[in-house]
């Protein structure tokens, strides 16, 4: 009887083991099929013609496709565009297909203020081209909308750095499909933070020559009168109290301190490091990145909609640049180690939402690293930039001494707002009346009649025009959470 019970028990265990092995084998087959499907789909997929897909993977892939499409509320054309960019990214980095040789890397990304005028104008104009509707679709808005679904997967955790690295890669790929010689530039906002006193509010970064004005509706620069989805106009409110630009001390800790030597020490909800100004423990590079979002204000302060301001791309390219400095510091192996204790949507093997061919850990791979030109320093003559200067104070013998952004005291406004304020929507008794021809002087009157249709006036006048324009629009309704600043710069 005992032998019979033992035999029955053994049969039951073997049956359970066989069932478990079958389930495991089924899961392995599913995973293999999924990888084959994704590879096949990304290289060949078009939602209007699925004949290129192996039948066994249609269900696997289409479930993912429909989920993302419904989440984003995208059309077939928009989804096809996103997948075409993913396909181009995979071919560039030969992910999942070792037969494709990696393409030669494009030229290094550099600080926006060190670009030549032609290079900078080409980049900005290409961004404007992406924004323009084509066949009923704005390619810019389609890419920007992808950020909407990334809050849980790409913020407040270890995947923040890798996800945004891939997001930059996708945006740059879209730019280069329009103009092959453009490369994203980064905005090193520590150079604006270092401006003395309260002068950072007058930084040349937020003027007509670079990103456009910084208070009220963006009325000048390459992105002037930039329309947001829903019809509102792009607005900013830079340097509000309770915010801060990126602090050099934080960047230097991440880039050079030998005690900070794992990715877990710089990501949100990781080990963190003490804030160099407040001493609070647990600071992260993501925390510091949040500060600049708040400093710019407007849609940049909104987590969901921040990519609708083109400044988003220049800020995040700098975030990626500093991460790359850190990766070079800690060396091979360590820099590709995804924080093992990350969980939930930030777990190493969790899918990278929006990039169906990747897991979170893939964002840390050297495959996606980019070359960067060093940030402007006094030793490299500030990159020969007319927008930067080498400060007189500080350790003069230090070759790594940072340059500082120049300030401006005037900017450009539409000429109609100066020559005919009532025609431009301002009453004769409004504050704009103070900035008519008699106030700005004969030389300004001459400039306002230039072919550009714009006049150079004081920053106060520029702010008045831009803020009045903002007041004429209904309040901007933004969905989802806002960024919060971890540091309050007492100078602003």
From Swiss-Prot:
Keyword RNA-binding: no
Positions bound to Cu cation A: 147, 155, 164
A molecular function GO annotation: metal ion binding
Enzyme Commission identifier(s): 1.14.18.-
Residue ranges, compositional bias (Polar residues): 482-492
Pfam families (alphabetical): Tyrosinase (PF00264)
Free-text tissue specificity from the UniProt record: Prismatic layer of shell (at protein level). Expressed primarily in the mantle with highest level in the mantle edge and lower level in the mantle pallium.
Subcellular location: Secreted
Positions with a binding annotation for Cu cation B: 289, 293, 316
Comment on bound cofactor: Binds 2 copper ions per subunit.
GO cellular component: extracellular region
Chain residue ranges for the region called Disordered: 472-492
Signal peptide from the UniProt entry: 1-22
InterPro entries named in the record: Di-copper_centre_dom_sf, Tyrosinase/Hemocyanin, Tyrosinase_Cu-bd
Keywords linked to the UniProt accession: Copper, Metal-binding, Oxidoreductase, Secreted, Signal
The protein's required cofactors: Cu(2+)
Stated name of the protein: Tyrosinase-like protein 1
The species this protein was found in: Margaritifera margaritifera (Freshwater pearl mussel)
């Amino acid at each position: 009887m005992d032998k019979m019970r033992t035999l029955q028990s053994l049969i039951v265990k073997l049956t359970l083991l066989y069932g478990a092995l079958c389930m495991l084998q089924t899961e392995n087959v599913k995973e293999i099929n999924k990888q084959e499907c994704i590879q096949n789909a990304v290289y060949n997929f078009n939602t209007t013609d699925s004949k290129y897909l192996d039948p066994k993977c249609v269900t696997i892939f289409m479930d993912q496709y429909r989920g993302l499409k419904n989440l984003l509320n995208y059309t077939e054309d928009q989804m096809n565009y996103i997948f075409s960019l993913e396909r181009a990214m995979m071919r560039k980095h030969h992910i999942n297909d070792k037969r494709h040789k990696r393409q030669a890397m494009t030229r290094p990304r550099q600080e926006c203020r060190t670009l030549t005028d032609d290079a900078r104008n080409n980049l900005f104009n290409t961004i404007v081209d992406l924004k323009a509707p084509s066949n009923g679709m704005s390619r810019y808005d389609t890419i920007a909308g992808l950020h909407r679904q990334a809050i849980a997967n790409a913020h407040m955790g270890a995947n923040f750095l890798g996800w945004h690295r891939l997001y930059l890669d996708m945006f740059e790929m879209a730019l280069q499909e329009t103009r092959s010689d453009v490369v994203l530039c980064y905005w090193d906002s520590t150079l604006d933070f270092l401006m003395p006193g309260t002068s950072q509010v007058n930084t040349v970064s937020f003027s007509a020559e670079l990103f456009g004005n910084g208070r009220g509706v963006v009325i000048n620069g390459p992105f002037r009168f930039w329309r947001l989805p829903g019809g509102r106009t792009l607005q900013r409110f830079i340097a509000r109290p309770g915010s801060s630009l990126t602090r050099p001390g934080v960047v230097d800790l991440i880039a050079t301190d030998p005690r900070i030597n794992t990715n877990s020490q710089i990501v949100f909800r990781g080990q963190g490091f003490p804030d160099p100004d407040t001493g609070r423990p647990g600071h992260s590079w993501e925390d510091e990145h949040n500060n600049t979002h708040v400093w710019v204000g407007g849609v940049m302060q909104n987590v969901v909609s921040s990519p609708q301001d083109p400044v988003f791309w220049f800020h995040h390219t700098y975030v990626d640049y500093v991460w790359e400095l850190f990766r070079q510091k800690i060396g091979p192996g360590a820099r590709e180690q995804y924080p093992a204790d990350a969980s939930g949507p930030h777990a190493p093997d969790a899918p990278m939402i929006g990039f169906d061919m990747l897991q979170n850990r893939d964002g840390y791979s050297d495959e996606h690293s980019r070359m960067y030109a060093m940030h402007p320093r006094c030793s490299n003559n500030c990159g020969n930039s007319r927008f930067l200067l080498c400060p007189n104070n500080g350790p003069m013998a230090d070759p790594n001494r940072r340059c500082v952004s120049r300030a401006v005291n005037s900017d450009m406004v539409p000429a109609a707002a100066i020559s005919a304020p009532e025609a431009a929507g301002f009453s004769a008794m409004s504050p704009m009346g103070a900035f008519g021809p008699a106030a700005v002087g004969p030389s300004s009157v001459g400039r306002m009649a230039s072919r550009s249709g714009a006049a150079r006036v004081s920053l106060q006048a520029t702010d008045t025009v831009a803020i009045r324009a903002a007041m004429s629009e209904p309040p901007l309704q933004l969905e989802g959470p806002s960024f919060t600043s971890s540091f309050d710069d007492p100078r602003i």
